[in-house]
Amino acid sequence: MKKSLIALTLAALPVAAMADVTLYGQVKAGVEVSRTKETVNHVSTKNKTATEIADFGSRIGFKGHEHLSNNLNAIWQVEQNTSVAGTDKGWGTRESFIGLEGGFGKVRAGKLNTALKDNSDSVDPWESSDANASVLQFGKLKRVDERKVSVRYDSPVFAGFSASAQYQPRDNANPEDKHVHDVKTRHSFDLGLNYENSGFFGRYAGTFAKRKVLSDDHLELFNSNTTLGSGVYKDYQAHRLVGGYDANNVLVSVAGQYEGFKADVADAKKNERTEVAVTGGYRMGNVMPRLSYAHGFKAKENGVKQGNSQYNQVIVGADYDFSKRTSALVSAGWLKEGKGGDKTQSTAGLVGLRHKF
């Protein structure tokens, strides 16, 4: 009898050791079609319609915790992209961290979402491939979203209010300069403030960097007709306010965003842009139809407003839930940048499937 009890205890030990580990993820993909029409000096040209099987951001992750003492836990997560097209590789390519959580809130270190990235879902619930994210998602608005190798503190919730603060050291922002420090620091700070009560919510997110590298892709999303080139810019900042209501089958969300930065030279003038977006939806049984609209006001480059830099975007679609885990997706998007005889119009649509586990 004693031997049987010992054997049962030993057999249960691996199960107990793994009890705090959770495997989770999403598999989502479908068919996308897209096309672009460009007008220059009132002469229009269209490219061929592209039709492709596309991954919509499939991912897999492992997370867990260990109880250390009264009201204190060790927490960890490792998450990575896993495209159904087999194009992703590597571990920890998404939010991955280790940290401590207790009555004080939580402190984490690793590759972490910024507050800006965290609050995007409040106004942009859409799915698509990266290639069509600027049409089928608010890709232009979300150009400021990042994950940074950093340390982040999240406060507990007090009467509906919570906050976060995040810091990326200079040698994580620019690892090629480590131990040398030949160039000026590119460390950054991120802040988040949130409020939720009875379905109503308000969220602020901001990022600040004395100097920051901006890529050609980022600058093209900033202004598709930009005169700016990739490189280091100074006094970088981005701010987003999101407010709305999400309860009782109703979703209404409004966002406003500002981004500003200067060339890293003396007496440089600001490059800046202001954008707004709104999303509405109403659940009817298993169906959640939604409609979104975004507008980008004219961008300023070197302090001068850029003609034909404004944009308008519309996304319409619906999710149909087969179950709590599996949903069918359908959406269509339209993006117009510029106006009159000089403009670019992009259209795209998708039909797909999403499964969460």
From Swiss-Prot:
**Species in which this protein is naturally found:** Neisseria sicca
The signal sequence is 1-19
For molecular function, the Gene Ontology terms on record are: porin activity
Superkingdom of this protein's organism: Bacteria
From the Swiss-Prot or TrEMBL record, give the protein name. Answer: Major outer membrane protein P.IB
- NCBIfam families attached to this UniProt entry: porin_porB_Neis
Q: Which InterPro entries match?
A: Gram-neg_bact_OMP, Gram_neg_porin_domain, Porin_dom_sf, Porin_Gram-ve, Porin_Gram-ve_CS, Porin_Neis
Q: What is the protein's membrane topology class? A: Multi-pass membrane protein
Per the UniProt entry, what are the Gene Ontology biological process annotations, in alphabetical order?
monoatomic ion transmembrane transport
Principal cellular location given in the protein's record: membrane
GO CC terms, sorted: cell outer membrane; pore complex
Question: Which controlled-vocabulary keywords does the entry list?
Answer: Cell outer membrane, Ion transport, Membrane, Porin, Signal, Transmembrane, Transmembrane beta strand, Transport
**One protein family per Pfam:** Porin_1
Q: Which family does it belong to?
A: Belongs to the Gram-negative porin family.
UniProt subunit comment: Homotrimer.
Q: What does this protein do?
A: Serves as a slightly cation selective porin.
**Compartments in which it is found:** Cell outer membrane
